[in-house]
Amino acid sequence: MNLTPREKDKLLIAMAAIVARRRLERGVKLNHPEAVALITDFVVEGARDGRPVAELMEAGAHVITRDQVMEGVAEMIHDIQVEATFPDGTKLVTVHEPIR
């Protein structure tokens, strides 16, 4: 299977998001990379489903809460920017203060 670097990045994020979901199910708090991967995956999949950019920007800030991440992680993440593929092309989605 020949994958482009972008496709490899997408797969890595998706796998990290799967790990993050499993940890949340077990009650384990997420670290920085897991939290970012989970929110990023939410945005990427929402874009593929055709959800509008503005909706993803707002909903992306409600994927996980401070109680679900390790101490200090929420303060480390001010913005998450994701290049996501929408039905009408690729767009940059920014989620401000994604962990509240």
UniProtKB/Swiss-Prot annotation:
Keywords: Cytoplasm, Hydrolase
Keyword Repeat: no
One Pfam family matching this protein: Urease_gamma
Pathway: Nitrogen metabolism; urea degradation; CO(2) and NH(3) from urea (urease route): step 1/1
Domain of life: Bacteria
One GO CC term on file: cytoplasm
One BP term from GO: urea catabolic process
Top EC category: hydrolase
GO molecular function: nickel cation binding; urease activity
InterPro entries, A to Z: Urease_gamma, Urease_gamma/gamma-beta_su, Urease_gamma_sf, Urease_subunit
Subunit (UniProt): Heterotrimer of UreA (gamma), UreB (beta) and UreC (alpha) subunits. Three heterotrimers associate to form the active enzyme.
Family the UniProt entry places it in: Belongs to the urease gamma subunit family.
NCBIfam families reported for this sequence: PRK13241.1, urease_gam
Name by which UniProt lists this protein: Urease subunit gamma
